[in-house]
Amino acid sequence: MDMVTMNIVDSAMVAICREMGVNVQKTAYSTIFSEAEDFTCALASPEGDMISVAEFCPAQIGGVPLLVRSMVKEIAKIEPGDVIVHNDPYRGGLHTPEHTMFKPIFVDDELMGFVVSIGHFVEVGGMVPGGFPGEATEIFHEGLRVPPVKLIKRGNDVPEVWKLLLANVRTPRGNYGDLRALISAVDMLSLIHI
């Protein structure tokens, strides 16, 4: 691939990630997304290598490869239409307030990569609101740990997972809106025709 074509493709990939981020800003319930921009959006290979990323929260970017690898290792069957959520620091997550959404990209039944969105949630359960207890002595004080699990399977919500996530936080309505914002970001690629 010549340099001009490579730059055009790179710019298109970054633009996709930026557009995903704008979608998060406009649809999230909490101001930590809309004002503080404490989220990021990326494209990754099936192996977890970063293809492209938007620059919303640079601190989250470095975690993408490990997050993808951890998720792929734990989810036995990844199918079109799946959306996987994950925040467990012991499985590559950044910390419990950082929820990551993954959506596989398939072309003719072949896994080509993942659309990834990461966002900092204001409330994740735990001993204090916000997930940053100074008195914490163990991970369970910090909030609900979510190993990689399908939140949406083949395009349909998994109600039991939604119930579990929303029953363990002080602000279920806000968390619902922010989860949907991150999902809307990973869904955007299906609306874009390259």
Residue spans of the language-model regions?
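Conserved small/polar residues in nucleotide/adenosyl-binding loops
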Residues: I192-I194
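Regulatory sensory and allosteric helical modules in signal-transduction proteins
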Residues: P46-V53, P65, R69-D88
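N-terminal cofactor/phosphate-binding cores enriched in small/glycine residues
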Residues: R18, V22-V24, A36-C41, P46, ...
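Mobile "lid/hinge" segments at catalytic clefts and subdomain interfaces of large enzymes
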Residues: L111-S190
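A short, polar/charged loop-to-alpha-helix boundary motif
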Residues: A59-M71, V122-G131
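A short, hydrophobic, proline-anchored segment that marks a local hinge/packing element in signaling
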Residues: T100-V107, V116
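Short, basic/aromatic recognition patches
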Residues: A12-A36, V72-K73, Y90-G92
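Short, small/polar residue-rich loop motifs at catalytic or cofactor-binding pockets
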Residues: E35-D38, P97-H99
